[in-house]
Amino acid sequence: MKTFQITRPDETIREALTDKINNLTKPKGSLGTLEELALQIGLIQQTLTPELRHPQNIIFAADHGIVDEGVSLSPKEITWQQISNFLHGGAGVNFLCRQHGFELKIVDAGVDYDLPYEKGIINMKVRKSSRNYLYEAAMTEEEMNLCIERGAEVVRQCHAEGCNVLSLGEMGIGNTSSSSMWMTCFTHIPLELCVGAGSGLDNAGVRHKYNVLQQALDHYQGDGSAHDLIRYFGGLEMVMAIGAMLQAAELKMIILVDGFIMTNCILAASQLYPEVLHYAIFGHQGDEAGHKLVLDAMGAKPLLNLGLRLGEGTGAICSYPIIDSAVRMINEMDNFAHAAITKYF
């Protein structure tokens, strides 16, 4: 598998960043999370004057073999149909990208359909759909490695275009199932608490989904390593997103983490490279069952709680103005000395 050079941000600049933030014309700590974000971004970028450049949202798309077991309300053709909607600008992620100035990239990681690549979709297809992990591994070792490498390749292109803040989204009917499997494997939270309605299952549907996933977990006979669990239960788009996250961290980019699926992707990524979490900002807590539990297990502090469960990167993009405010705070607020205000604490 491709290796990455991911290190914790150098702490040498922390004291200077903290002093700058504390000497802005406000009571110490009074801008709360904005101050925490400014410190984190300053550490990532190793500067007292951080900036956000050319924000991009990448949607990785693929189909899932486990859908054959009736674990999703939506048929798998919704995957390619929604991609068509992205291309026409009519999806939830489209208006948010337009509103907040994000470039949108759509990547075919493994859609079970022949997509119109000439219309701007990035063709990184590894295979048409993952396999059904109720019976066999979702992907081979070679396919997993290709996903990691191709996700990294997309991010290197974003970086070359001047991007330093990256939101990652997904499109793939069945991917909440893979997310639940990773969540229970890596946090040891009982599977039943990790399984939710996905795109809208009723209580009976959720119970059936849980039963199928529990059978898959019971049938698993791998070595139990993070690498093997990612390969066995993962989605092609999700593993490609892991490659993207790891490459972004190596390039010292800000990673905006979206909802339940992307949270479990960075959870999985952190099993391979724990330092990746230093580059992550968690955009929101979604409405999918299990999202709060996995965030809590990671010690993550999401910026928003809007009851979202769409995916696509929508929650991460919604959080962007808060991140922008944090950067503006450290760059645009005056300090006590320059403003001739007595420092009163």
From Swiss-Prot:
Transmembrane segments: none annotated. It is an enzyme of class 2 (transferase). Its EC number is 2.4.2.21. GO terms for molecular function: nicotinate-nucleotide-dimethylbenzimidazole phosphoribosyltransferase activity. One of its GO terms (biological process) is cobalamin biosynthetic process. The keyword Flavoprotein does not apply. It comes from the Bacteria. This is Nicotinate-nucleotide--dimethylbenzimidazole phosphoribosyltransferase.
